[in-house]
């Protein structure tokens, strides 16, 4: 990251509570920046027996934001996830396809619903995806990463 390029930008970090997005917050903090952090909630309001609990993820995201002096806001995108990702995935599986729900979640929820609700107020939105960008002819492009094992540009392919 080039500090001169981002120091005056309003930055949002999508903080999942995992290692990768936590490192993003650490990297910004090491540059003296304190982005606003957002935890995207995609689980239902009530605990369901089939639901993956996000409680620990939210606790970790809260701890990371607090450690680096960043604000953390929970953004409820359960409805959007269910109607746009889960339903789409089920329809495609029924039709004999093997969709990738993570790709759809990134496009429709992380960079779709989040952007409509809050992200449009920010100059930059950072995630913990392992990817690179490259400047070509004055435009920034998503490019593959040097480590093919960690490579995650496929998850960002449709944004």
Task: Show where each model-derived region lies.
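ATP-dependent adenylation/nucleotidyltransferase module used to activate substrates
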Residues: 1-158
């Amino acid at each position: 990251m080039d500090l001169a390029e981002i120091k005056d930008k309003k930055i949002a970090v999508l903080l999942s509570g995992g290692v990768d997005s936590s490192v993003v917050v650490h990297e910004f903090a090491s540059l003296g920046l304190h982005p606003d952090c957002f935890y995207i909630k995609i689980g239902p309001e009530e605990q369901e027996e089939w639901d993956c609990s996000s409680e620990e993820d939210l606790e970790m995201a809260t701890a990371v934001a607090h450690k680096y002096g960043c604000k953390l806001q929970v953004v409820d995108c359960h409805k959007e996830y269910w109607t746009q990702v889960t339903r789409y995935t089920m329809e495609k599986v029924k039709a004999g396809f093997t969709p990738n729900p993570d790709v759809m979640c990134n496009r429709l929820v992380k960079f779709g619903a989040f952007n409509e609700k809050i992200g449009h107020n920010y100059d930059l939105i950072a995630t913990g995806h392992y990817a690179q960008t490259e400047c070509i002819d004055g435009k920034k492009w998503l490019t593959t990463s040097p480590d093919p094992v960690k490579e995650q540009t496929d998850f960002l392919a449709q944004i």
